[in-house]
Amino acid sequence: MIRKDLSQIPTYVPGKRNDHALKLSSNEVTHRPLPSAAQAMAEAAAGANRYPDMGVTELRGALSEHLGVPAEQIAVGCGSSALCQQLVQITCTPGDEVVFPWRSFEAYPIFVQVVGATPVAVPLTSDGFNDLDAMAAAITPKTKLVFVCNPNNPSGTVVRREAFLEFMAKVPADVVVALDEAYTEYVRDEDTIFATEILSEFPNLVGLRTFSKAFGLAGVRVGYAFGPHELIDALNKVALPFGVNAVGQAGALASLNNLDELMEHTEEVVAVRDRVADHIGAAHSQANFVWIPAESRSETPFEIAEKLAAHDVLVRAFPEGVRITVTNEEESDRLLAAWDASFA
């Protein structure tokens, strides 16, 4: 009854959780939603007997003002992950190819294989950057979509403007490029490319962002895409009806209306992430996490995670390294104490 190829598709594995431990495994913020957002969500929940606004009209209007992009060129989805999958759906059929960096967001190959397309994973450079030259070289006549993760999850590196423009010059006009900017609010590198800056230059470019990270709304699943009309219209065609719930819409809108307060929270992360990285021997990052490559330690990534878990700190281990969320000074001090107790 079930497609035989599904047995070959990996299941997405979330970060570990433990109510008694410090959870630094899923790149969540430590702050609860803003009081105004919490109130808006509570009011929306009281009307849960009604369907949400399927067009997400009010939130798209606010996003239009925030991004400087017409509302008609914005699609809102059940997290940016859903929009990643929708991008694969609108571009690919079985036998087509999708290029993406690796290691990167672990759901990319899952989304690709679900529609029967072929994942083409391009290794990062030795210092953890998207290898744009290699990604461009990996494009074939079968390629329909390219994901570029900026900042890259889990290495925390960014894509520089000049390098991205050179990359786009090599990409065929009929191949869609998705610039995944889930952690963009944490970026302080002035040379970083942002999709909003060049959207009008490329009819095959779409940007992806989320309310799950810096906005602190991971539990209500709201993300958004912005790009040319043709791509946004197609994304809306394959979207699950009423897929963005009313509670999430209300929380996202209230958060956008209090952006200054939210950005203060991101500054807490920026203020401590280099100190955390230097203490544990991780690379500096432009996101709310740091990355320890496997080759930089004598312990395996899974041994590192196990030792920290013994001190009630949960981190995310991959075969290629360990990713550790950075939140604020208090939790960072707790992390570093656990690190010293484990590895000093």
From Swiss-Prot:
Modified residues (N6-(pyridoxal phosphate)lysine): 213
Alphabetical UniProt keywords: Aminotransferase, Pyridoxal phosphate, Transferase
Reaction catalyzed: an aromatic L-alpha-amino acid + 2-oxoglutarate = an aromatic oxo-acid + L-glutamate
The keyword Transferase is annotated on this UniProt entry: yes
GO terms (BP aspect): L-histidine biosynthetic process
EC number: 2.6.1.57
Top EC group: transferase
Matches recorded under SUPFAM superfamilies: PLP-dependent transferases (SSF53383)
Domain of life: Bacteria
Required cofactor(s): pyridoxal 5'-phosphate
The family this protein is said to belong to: Belongs to the class-II pyridoxal-phosphate-dependent aminotransferase family.
Subunit structure comment from the entry: Homodimer.
Function: Aminotransferase that catalyzes the conversion of aromatic amino acids and 2-oxoglutarate into corresponding aromatic oxo acids and L-glutamate.
Protein name stated in the entry: Aromatic amino acid aminotransferase
Organism: Corynebacterium diphtheriae (strain ATCC 700971 / NCTC 13129 / Biotype gravis)
Phylogenetic classification of the source organism: Bacteria, Bacillati, Actinomycetota, Actinomycetes, Mycobacteriales
Chain's gene name: pat
